[in-house]
Amino acid sequence: MKRLLIAVSLLFWNATIAVAAEPNAMKLHDAPQPLPSLAFTDEEGTPLTLEAWRGKVVLLNIWATWCGTCRREMPTLDRLQAELGSDRFEVVALSIDRAGVGVVREFFDEIEIRNLKIFIDESGKAARDLQVFCLPTTILVSPDGMELGRLIGPAEWDTPEMIEFFGA
């Protein structure tokens, strides 16, 4: 029964994505792709994986404070989370800063990020496992943890088109 529910949910999600246009060069896959197991921590150092968001659509943004385009797009991700963040959708901004959570907290405070939580992978292993070669890279993850699409480079995440795409 659980497998049937997941299959129906995935079909519904794929149908929704097919109706909405691909925004800002988000490349959607023909079929969902498996993701490697990722390990990272939150601001308090609590270990996490993407399993923490099972059942939600996740917009996983891999970024760093030293990346200029990442810094410029972060407020738009914050506004997208403010607009759509719910029990069905979450923006997960995963920093790969080796300097640690302090530089991320300082940056979030500096630009008044209020809706995103801090997640960090100081080792950079998550980015390597995801084959992220350019920052920022943003991955659309299905409620069952599969990669639906990927955008390499920055985007304006809070445009009406993006809100419609993710809110559909």
Walk through the language-model features, giving the residues of each.
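Loop/turn elements at helix/coil->beta-strand transitions in domains of secreted/extracellular proteins
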Residues: G55-V57, D87-E90, N115
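Sec-dependent N-terminal signal peptides
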Residues: L4-W13
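Structural microenvironment flanking redox-active thiols in thiol-disulfide oxidoreductases
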Residues: R71-I111, E122-D129
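Alpha/beta-hydrolase fold active-site loops
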Residues: V57-V58, P136
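Cleavable N-terminal signal peptides
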Residues: A7, A18-V19
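Thiol/disulfide oxidoreductase modules built on the thioredoxin-like
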Residues: E106-N115, D121-G167
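Conserved redox-active cysteine motifs that mediate thiol-disulfide chemistry
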Residues: R54, I62-R79
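N-terminal "domain-start" segment that seeds a small globular fold
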Residues: A20-L50
